[in-house]
């Protein structure tokens, strides 16, 4: 079973913020396929569905961002999900807005949600989709910037990014070839 995790903070006030872009991709995929997060366990909201003939678990941690591993690790253990079947979607300040980067593995890169998952799983050897949100250009504090809602103009770009990220996940589920999907989907979304 594949496990797709979107990172974000719970609560209405965090919707459509830079830090919640992982949730936005999961929500988009759920809506497109008429699925819903109908289960809760181990601090995570989740569902298990069939997509492209594969069993897939979608997870949104119900913790704050920096405790995301407390939801992901126990759910993966409970359902006996292999680390190679995990993909985590999250915001990345080091990528320009409108760009995604798929990676087979890597460090947390300063992202506290990823730090928590890596710590709880005991490895950084899992797939991820980094979604560019850019860095603040006006000297704004990082914490304020990532918790700020996207402007309407930014949201137009991010809606394309959300859809592109969802297509990348679907392409991986269909092909089971992450290397090919990386080659096709990495980069700027036009």
From Swiss-Prot:
Instruction: Show the active-site residues.
Output: 19 (proton acceptor)
Q: Where is this site: Stabilizes the basic form of H active site to accept a proton?
A: 91
Per its UniProt record, what SUPFAM superfamilies does this chain match? Peptidyl-tRNA hydrolase-like (SSF53178)
Q: Where in the cell is it found?
A: Cytoplasm
Query: Which InterPro entries does this one have?
Result: Pept_tRNA_hydro (IPR001328), Pept_tRNA_hydro_CS (IPR018171), Pept_tRNA_hydro_sf (IPR036416)
Q: Does the keyword Protein biosynthesis apply?
A: no
Swiss-Prot/TrEMBL site (Discriminates between blocked and unblocked aminoacyl-tRNA) positions: 9
Its EC top class is hydrolase
* Record keywords: Cytoplasm, Hydrolase, RNA-binding, tRNA-binding
Sample GO molecular function, one term: peptidyl-tRNA hydrolase activity
Pfam families given in the database record: Pept_tRNA_hydro (PF01195)
Q: What is its main location?
A: cytoplasm
**Stated family:** Belongs to the PTH family.
Question: What HAMAP family does its record include?
Answer: Pept_tRNA_hydro_bact
What name goes with this protein? Peptidyl-tRNA hydrolase
The top of its lineage is: Bacteria, Bacillati, Bacillota, Bacilli, Bacillales
Gene responsible for this protein: pth
